Design a protein with these regions (language model features):
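A short SAM/SAH-binding and catalytic strip from SAM-dependent methyltransferases
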Residues: 141-152
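Class I SAM-dependent methyltransferase SAM/SAH-binding core
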Residues: 78-80, 84-131
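Conserved Class I S-adenosyl-L-methionine
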Residues: 203-262
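A short glycine-rich, Lys/Arg-flanked "PGG" loop and its adjoining helix->strand segment in the class I
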Residues: 155-167
Length: 262
């Protein structure tokens, strides 16, 4: 198969995976799919959460780290790759934006999110990261958390981010790559036409989250049947999987970035 087709194949494969997840995993309490973020510095104060949010603490802390990097009060916010909607819903109810639109390629995930999350100013729509169904300069901020590794090369996605952002808007990004691929990701971000305001390596925070959240995720995954159990172990980067080890050894590096449109 030619290299030109590989990005499309990657997108199709991940699309199939997330459609399957959304259609088969009906547990309404499962609204986040990221690896999470935990403090690693002595003396760091835990994020204050409502009691209902406590089970999702580490997932929420990643969204707080990424989306909380700029003031979203009164802003129109887009999340690309909103999954099961927990991140968009958290941003909407805690950061006082004017609106939050969650967009995902998997229509089943969009349908789940529409049913599961209801809040003034919050909506979910189907759409592709490389052809967003929005007018130019529609949003003050675009959020993208742990999703871009499913896209292949990012040039078209970043072009779309640039297009839908208003002048002086922000792109709030977090994802991981292998040690061999991380510099290519940085180059793609640098050549996007957006100005890099800040980059933070958060691999230790993500790995600590995987350690602390292991038991809760294991108990959730044990509800699934044996045929898919081993797949979900790896998907969730449970202890003992190669994904868990890749963050422990640094083979995978996780970064968060704030970029601004001039």
């Amino acid at each position: 198969m030619s290299k030109a087709r590989r990005p499309n194949l990657r997108r199709l494969l991940w699309h199939a995976v997330y459609e399957f997840l959304a259609r088969t995993m009906k547990h309404e309490e499962w609204t986040f799919m990221n690896y999470g973020y935990a403090s690693v510095q002595p003396g760091d104060v835990d994020l204050k959460l409502a009691g209902a949010d406590e089970p999702d603490r580490y997932h929420i802390q990643l969204y707080h780290h990424v989306a909380g990097a700029v003031d979203l009060h009164g802003k129109d916010v887009l999340e690309v790759g909103s999954g099961r909607g927990g991140g968009s819903a958290y941003i909407c109810r805690t950061m006082r934006p004017k609106s939050v639109t969650g967009m995902d390629l998997a229509r089943a995930a969009v349908a789940f999110s529409q049913k599961r999350h209801s809040s003034p100013g919050l909506s979910f729509v189907p759409g592709s990261s490389d052809a967003m169904p929005f007018d130019d300069e529609s949003f003050d901020a675009v959020v993208n958390v742990e999703s871009s590794h499913c896209y292949g090369p990012l040039q078209q996605f970043l072009s779309e981010v640039h297009r839908v952002l208003k002048p002086e808007g922000h792109f709030l990004f977090a994802d991981f790559r292998s040690r061999a691929e991380i510099d290519a990701l940085r180059c793609e971000l640098k050549s996007s036409g957006l100005a890099l305001v800040r980059e933070t390596v958060i691999t230790p925070n993500v790995f600590r989250s995987l350690e602390l959240d292991h038991r809760r995720k294991l108990e959730l995954i044990e509800r699934f049947g044996a045929p898919v159990r081993s797949y979900f172990d790896r998907f969730a980067a449970l202890q003992g999987t190669d994904m868990f080890e890749s963050f422990r050894t640094g083979e995978n590096e996780y970064i968060s970035c704030v970029l601004a449109k001039p």
